[in-house]
Regions:
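Flexible "arm" and connector segments at domain edges
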Residues: 1-76, 80-121
Length: 121
């Protein structure tokens, strides 16, 4: 599926009351918080640990690991929906944003500036 197709189809599910910058921006942050909250709860329960910059499942049952992974994927989808919505209310196509980001990253990589801080590097 193309990103712009996803954006259009996702926004077909958007209620009129949600089609505004404030809702999309604030709820994007909320959805990221829900994702991180689910990870934190599983860390507290010792079902997940973070090591080598990735999540490691420590469930004793495979079904529980798949269920947790499914919940996190669902939250990632909610984050993606909110990002698509934020771009839509700004009048931006997701594909354009993705291309701009890849161009910026390629430029930084060519100049040896991938690692660092600040927008203008």
């Amino acid at each position: 599926m193309e990103l712009n197709e996803y954006q259009k189809r996702a926004m077909d599910t958007c209620m009129l009351s949600c089609d505004n910058f404030s809702y999309m921006a604030l709820n994007l942050v909320a959805e990221v918080g829900e994702f991180v909250g689910k990870v934190a709860k599983q860390i507290r329960k010792e079902n997940i640990e973070i090591g080598d910059n990735r999540l490691w499942y420590r469930f004793t049952e495979t079904d529980a690991a798949y269920a947790c992974d499914g919940e996190l994927m669902s939250e990632a989808g909610d984050i993606f929906w909110q990002l698509a919505g934020l771009c839509a209310v700004m009048g931006w196509d997701l594909e354009d944003i993705a291309q701009l980001n890849l161009k910026k990253l390629a430029s930084r990589q060519e100049r040896g500036l991938i690692d660092g801080n600040g927008d203008n590097r």
